[in-house]
Swiss-Prot record:
<protein>
    <recommendedName>
        <fullName>Large ribosomal subunit protein uL5</fullName>
    </recommendedName>
</protein>
<keyword id="KW-0687">Ribonucleoprotein</keyword>
<dbReference type="InterPro" id="IPR002132">
    <property type="entry name" value="Ribosomal_uL5"/>
</dbReference>
<dbReference type="InterPro" id="IPR031310">
    <property type="entry name" value="Ribosomal_uL5_N"/>
</dbReference>
<comment type="subunit">
    <text>Part of the 50S ribosomal subunit; part of the 5S rRNA/L5/L18/L25 subcomplex. Contacts the 5S rRNA and the P site tRNA. Forms a bridge to the 30S subunit in the 70S ribosome.</text>
</comment>
<dbReference type="GO" id="GO:0003735">
    <property type="term" value="F:structural constituent of ribosome"/>
</dbReference>
<keyword id="KW-0689">Ribosomal protein</keyword>
<keyword id="KW-0699">rRNA-binding</keyword>
<dbReference type="Pfam" id="PF00673">
    <property type="entry name" value="Ribosomal_L5_C"/>
</dbReference>
<dbReference type="GO" id="GO:0006412">
    <property type="term" value="P:translation"/>
</dbReference>
<dbReference type="InterPro" id="IPR031309">
    <property type="entry name" value="Ribosomal_uL5_C"/>
</dbReference>
<keyword id="KW-0820">tRNA-binding</keyword>
<dbReference type="GO" id="GO:1990904">
    <property type="term" value="C:ribonucleoprotein complex"/>
</dbReference>
<dbReference type="InterPro" id="IPR020930">
    <property type="entry name" value="Ribosomal_uL5_bac-type"/>
</dbReference>
<dbReference type="GO" id="GO:0005840">
    <property type="term" value="C:ribosome"/>
</dbReference>
<dbReference type="InterPro" id="IPR022803">
    <property type="entry name" value="Ribosomal_uL5_dom_sf"/>
</dbReference>
<keyword id="KW-0694">RNA-binding</keyword>
Amino acid sequence: MSALKEYYTNECVPALKDQLGYTNPMQIPKIEKIVLNMGLGEAVQNPKIVEGAAEELTKIAGQRAVVTKAKKSIATFKLREGMPIGCRVTLRGEKMYDFLSKLVNIALPRVRDFRGVSPKGFDGRGNYSMGIQEQIIFPEIDYDKIDKIKGFNITIVTSAKTNDEGRSLLRLMGMPFKK
């Protein structure tokens, strides 16, 4: 069992139970999955960019990235249906906790001028989304081997019913929110 999962079970669950006033431990919010998504608009001109991006996302997540394809053709963007336009990874279970631990303890502190993540990234149902501008904050990415600095989105899906429950859960898990 990963250290963060153990911490969640032993520390976060009792704290959330008291804080939110739940009686049943199954009512307590938990993290269900983490989705990493990298959309590449420049892949329209150069489809080979997607392969490199998928490789980088695979290194960051520790799980193979899936290439996403365009659902519709859009003439103004010179986009055809079925063209590769990005990649994504969905993490669950052990890998999800390992990634969250790496994000909070290693990657986020390496962001330039980091003062905490925005508390406005909640969607109304307790899920949190944030953007990473540079993939080089992760230790798996070698700065000399990348062709271009790319950003990606991280969505943390929780079983929380409200934003406040989701915020409490993530704060207890170590997510550094801005004051």
